[in-house]
Amino acid sequence: MKKKNMFLQLALTAALLVSTFSTTAYASDVTSTRDIPVGGSGQVEMVGTIEPTILTVTMPTFVPFNISNSLSTQNKVISPRINVKNNSNVPVQVDVAYTSVDISKLKNTTWSNTGAVTANQIAIGLKQEETPGEMPKDLSNARWLEANKQQDMNVLILNSNQEGALYVVGTLGQDVSESATFNVTPTFVVRKTSGTAN
């Protein structure tokens, strides 16, 4: 019986030592301690830090597109599908904050900020994909890029870890120079949102 009790005491002591060391390992970041007697009480101040939410969205850095009046559709742009993926665990919105436009190679051409064009105007915008894998034919719900000015325009809302797509859309007047290039460079901003994607 004595041997059995001695064995239990050793086993209990070993278990307490293991639990003490494992507790100490987890509590290594505690800066100060104090004794609380059995039957007594004491306060422990606990300070929590809320870490910033990491927002990441993957999208291309270069998108080539063609625009031509020879297309019979309202949308005169042939654009690749612009895949956008929210890699965050929270919903995000993708906004255009500013668009740099250089149409200096297009002689006698001006930019339209609204999508309505005269004979010498061009307009470019972004449109959320409505039919999977299908380029838009019309310009309804297009978000028009305003040339060389601040713009706070939402183009896409994505739920957590959701993928979505945009297309470049646009139109041009019949007198806009052909066989010339121009640059449109929108600056995208990703923000946390309380809204949800459709």
Q: Each PLM stretch: what is its role?
A:
Residues 1-27:
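Sec-dependent N-terminal signal peptides of Gram-positive bacterial secreted proteins and lipoproteins
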Residues 15, 26, 80-81, 167:
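Generic detector of isolated residues embedded in canonical secondary-structure elements
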Residues 25-80, 88, 174-198:
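Short, polar/proline-rich extracytoplasmic segments that appear immediately after membrane translocation
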Residues 28-31, 37, 66-143:
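Surface-exposed interaction patch
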Residues 47-49, 84, 154-159:
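Short, exposed beta-strand/loop patches in secreted or surface proteins that constitute
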Residues 62-64, 97-102, 165-173:
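Generic short beta-strand segments
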Residues 81-83, 93-95, 165-169, 183-187:
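Beta-strand secondary-structure signal
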Residues 147-178:
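Low-complexity, intrinsically disordered segments enriched in Ser/Thr together with acidic residues
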